[in-house]
Amino acid sequence: MALLNRLAKTFSPYYGLNKVEQKLLIKIDWFILSYCCVSYFINYLDRSSINNAYLSGMQEDLKMHGNELQDINVVFTCGYIIGQLPGSYALQRVPARLWFSVMNILWGLMTIFSFAVHSVRALMILRFFMAVAEASTFAGTHYILGAWYKESELCKRAGIFSASGLVGTMFAGYLQTAVHSSLNGKGGLSGWRWLFIIDGILTIPLSLYGLFLFPDVPETTKAPYFTEQEKELSFKRLPARPKKKPLTLKAIKDIVRSWRIYGLCILWIFSGETQAIAVNVLMGQWMKWSNKFSVAQINNYPTVITAVGVVSTLGASVISDKLAGNPRWPFGLFLCVITTVSATILLAWNVPDGAKFFAYFASGCTYAGQAVWFSWANDICRDNDQERGVVVFLMNMCQNIWHIWWAPIMYPNTDTPRFIKGLIGLLVVGGIVFVSSCIVSYMQIRDKRIKRSIQDAKDFDDVFTEHESLELKKIGKNDEESLNTTNAVKEISSPGLVITRQRISMPKETNAQD
């Protein structure tokens, strides 16, 4: 029984809550996570489908040659980058249920239209605008999660969301296999064209579901499934936030002057690159180069990396929320260790295949950083909703900008199978992630200390003012005694801040009688 209680305390997201809050949290989880996770799943299903379509007949049908697939993916990434800041601004002004649903419908329609393309140029144009519509999904979801969940609840939900995208990556290959075997040639369409039709159709019911049932944010929610008591509790249970204001030029200047935007963007830029072994398909390229493995093995074995990513993401999310004080920096050390071990084994190269498999599979653990770092960004910027929205989108945008030039330089296909340059870079990247996580942690602690000092000073000032008021009441209006007040210096000290208050009052005129 004690073991079951311990497991429940560790893994249950509702352990220790009263019935009212537990019921509220179950509703939030269902209506937010169900929509966001399915959306992200389809998002990654679509991203992976372009590569599967290429291998399943699209190359021949569109007469693709050279690096045209890479060019299509670069165009997609450019659209994704361009869509970040408009998406951030829109979610500050437009209800999330409207923005997400409209973007998903546009994205779904353009995915369906992809079945009709007959040139690479037409496909590039569609992929560009699909990426713009898709750009709000990832960072926008992290922004919404940060609006609904406490610091101790957030990372678990972010982990589930991140894992859903990884599952979409795994599922894409299986879906393409099923579609190609059952629909290829039906209606005069190739299997890859049917894949785009199916991917697009999946988004339409999801968009309608979000339009009517997604709850927006606690302060403005009109979701019919929340009672009035639950609506009030949904924002009262969270730390107090300043009233939401428009994103003005002054607000942008304040955000740019803060360390947060730079520290968190640098952290995610390099943390995203720790996923290089998986993202750049190094394992599949080695397996194909070695001529030891069948086509099925080359397609299926690398999915273990993604499976490891799912497990490590969920595990890191649970642990992060359960650690006392919810520290996030230890995961910088974790990513540094994983990248160092994997890169060192692969740089050595002349090791048994089993060691190579271990290095490739272990690299899947680097996916764990995504949920942890975006939860951390929400925690750090919780006191400024404008900054929080801008920072989570900029983190995602900056990482994509970095990756668009980093990957071709560090992991070109000509370096197959060893990728020595990229793996040396991976060692450096792991170290930068650890150092930057420590710096961000230090700055967060410093901010909390200053904020606590200011609050202590305010509390003291309130008490001091109340004491003065009581003293004046005691004196009374008709008190004929003179009030001689000498300099009264009140000094309080707290970590990082010293506040001194000096009160000086002139003596009243005294009677002339001796």
From Swiss-Prot:
Membrane topology type: Multi-pass membrane protein
Name the record gives this protein: Pantothenate transporter liz1
TM stretches of this protein: 24-44, 72-92, 98-118, 128-148, 159-179, 194-214, 263-283, 300-320, 329-349, 357-377, 390-410, 423-443
One of the record's GO cellular component terms: plasma membrane
Source species: Schizosaccharomyces pombe (strain 972 / ATCC 24843) (Fission yeast)
Swiss-Prot/TrEMBL keywords: Cell membrane, Membrane, Transmembrane, Transmembrane helix, Transport
Disulphides: none
Family: Belongs to the major facilitator superfamily. Allantoate permease family.
